[in-house]
Amino acid sequence: MIGAGLAGTEAAWQVAEAGLDVQLVEMRPIRRSPAHHSSECAELVCSNSFGALSSDRAAGLLQEELRRLGSVVIQMADRHAVPAGGALAVDRGRYSASLTQLLEQHPRVSFVREEQIALPATDQVTVLATGPLTSDALAEDLRRFTGRADCHFFDAASPIVEGDSVDMTQAFRASRYDKGDADYINCPMNREQYLGFRDALLAAEQAELKDFDQGNATFFEGCLPIEELARRGEDTMRYGPLKPIGLWDPRWGDVNDRDVRRAKRAYAVVQLRQEDKDGRLWNLVGFQTNLKWGEQKRVLQMIPGLEGAEFVRFGVMHRNTFLEAPALLDATLQFRSRPNLLAAGQITGTEGYAAAVAGGWLAGTNAARLVRGERPIDLPRTTMVGALTHFISEAPSGKFQPMPPNFGLLPELPERIRDKRARYGAYRDRALADLLLAREEQALGNVPCPA
C-alpha cells in the first residue's frame, strides 16, 4: 500500500483482515505535503465532514453501503462523530489517531515511513493510494508509466477558530431547518455588512502558489475558494455557503410568524461547524481560501461575531493531482496495462472522503483476492460504490473531471417517481438490496472493527 490516507488506510485494513501481510508506505513525517499537519493515518486535510448522514442522500447512501461492507474508516467515523446537524462530522484529531493506532497494532500491518519515489516491482500486488497530494517524484514516475500527463485542480481548506472567542451576543446556535440539535454557530449579516465583506474579499491579497494562475486555474466546483465565489457575482455567496434560508435566531421572534420572518431574516449567514468532541474548535463552513494569512484574519474578523476570533489554523490552497482514470483503470480499480497494480481514493478521480474510502475498500478487497488467486470483483452499478467505480472507468476521456457521489450516476428506476424524496428513497432501497445480494454471493464485508 502506497499512502496512508483514507483510501490507503481502508485498503490496508481489508487486506490485513483477509489474513495477508501488508506493507504500508507513508512519506509523512519524513516529507510533508502542502496541506497535511500530522503524520497520522487518514488525516482529514479539508473539512471534518463526510457529508449528509441520511441514506436518502447520495453521500449518506455511500456511507451506509460502506458500513454494511465492514469499512473500518466509516465505523471509526461513527465512533468519533461530533454534532453536525444532518451530517457525519468527526473530531479529526482523535479520529486519525485511533485509526493510526489500529493499524500500528495490527499484527499483519508493517509501516514504512519513507517517500516512495517510483512504482514497485511488477511482480508485487500494489495499491496506489497516494491521494491528490502525490509527491512530485512519484507523480513523474506515474507519468512515465501511463504515458499521460496527470490531471489536476486546485483545492483549499477552511480556517478554524476557538469557540470561546466567538461573540455569542451577535451569533446564535441553530441547525438549518432545525434538523437535529442546534449544532452550528451562525453569524448573521445584514446587506451592508455582506457587501462590505465581499468587497474586502475581492481586494484581499492572495498567497503565492506554485503553478497557480488565477486567470487559468481549474477548481473543483463543489469546493470553490470563498474569494472565487465572491468574484463570480454579488449574490453567489448568498446562494452558496452564506445562504440564510432555514436559519433562525429565537431572539428574532416567533419563527412561525411569516411577517416576523420576512422582516427579521438575515441577509446572509456564515456558519461554523464543530471540529472536536469538546466543542473548543470550530471551522468556517465553505470558507476554503488562498488568501494570505494576515489577510484572512483581517477580512474574516469583519464577520459579525468573529471580530475577536482566535484562529488556530488558517486556510491553505494546494494542487490536487488525479489520473485520467477512464483511459487507465477498470471498474475493479486495476490498471489495464498492469492488473496487479490498483489505484484507490481521490487520485482515481472520485471526490469526497466517503468516495475515497469506497475506493480503498474495493482496491483492498481486490488486492487480497489477487494474492489468493481469486477473480477481482466490482459491485453492481445500482449501488453507489459500484456506480462511482464504473463511472471513473467508463467516462469519456479527454475532459474527465472528479466526480462526487450523486444519484445521477445510478441507473434509472423502472418506474418514474416524481417526488424527489420518494425517488431518492427508492434508489436507496434498491442499492441496499442489491448490495446485500452481492455480499451474499461473494461473501463480502461485515468485518467489525475492534473496540
Swiss-Prot record:
Pfam families: GIDA (PF01134). The keyword Amino-acid biosynthesis does not apply. It catalyses: uridine(54) in tRNA + (6R)-5,10-methylene-5,6,7,8-tetrahydrofolate + NADH + H(+) = 5-methyluridine(54) in tRNA + (6S)-5,6,7,8-tetrahydrofolate + NAD(+); uridine(54) in tRNA + (6R)-5,10-methylene-5,6,7,8-tetrahydrofolate + NADPH + H(+) = 5-methyluridine(54) in tRNA + (6S)-5,6,7,8-tetrahydrofolate + NADP(+). The keyword Cell cycle does not apply. SUPFAM superfamilies: FAD/NAD(P)-binding domain (SSF51905). One of its GO terms (cellular component) is cytosol. Keywords: Cytoplasm, FAD, Flavoprotein, Methyltransferase, NAD, NADP, Transferase, tRNA processing. InterPro entries: FAD/NAD-bd_sf, MnmG-rel, MnmG_N, TrmFO. It is an enzyme of class 2 (transferase). Its EC number is 2.1.1.74. FAD binds at residues 3-8. Belongs to the MnmG family. TrmFO subfamily. This is Methylenetetrahydrofolate--tRNA-(uracil-5-)-methyltransferase TrmFO. The gene is trmFO.
